Amino acid sequence: MNNSYYGVDIRTIDSIAMADLLSQILAGNIRKEDREELEAQGRMPYGGLYESMTTSIEAYYAIHENMPLAAFGIGLCPEGCSIWMLGTTMCERHKKALVACMQDYIKDSLKKYKVLTNYISKDNTKALRVIKKMGAAFGEEVETGGKTFVRFTLKE
């Protein structure tokens, strides 16, 4: 998926060393919403990023002018395939590029995997709005770490 969107390049995370470096960089400036979701799951930003990148069946990062903005990918879960994205505070400045990228990524991923799912904190209203615009259906709610998460599902 090595593409470019409005000056934001998308590259494959293709090594443990790259995952480690990206996790360190992204964790230092992670979005408040992502930090809170990770902490509710009992994970710190570096660990959550690193685990997501290294256990996924595919993982990518978005970069602008040599500064990583976000990482995203697909991991396996009991329900099938779990799509995820964790980003920095710089994501807001590059929202148009990242939304276009994720629209393409979801479309391509649904062709391969048919169904994508995950949970988003109900407090993460921006992410819920975006994923809804991309066609997500919302389902069960679960409590973890003092936060309510809602399950979303995307289907081909």
Task: Indicate where each model-derived feature is located.
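A short beta-loop-alpha structural element at the N-terminal edge
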Residues: 2-29
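Conserved GNAT-fold acetyl-CoA-binding loop/helix
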Residues: 30-49
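Conserved acetyl-CoA binding element of GNAT-fold acetyltransferases
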Residues: 79-91, 150
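Conserved acetyl-CoA-binding loop-helix of GNAT-fold acetyltransferases
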Residues: 93-108, 129, 133
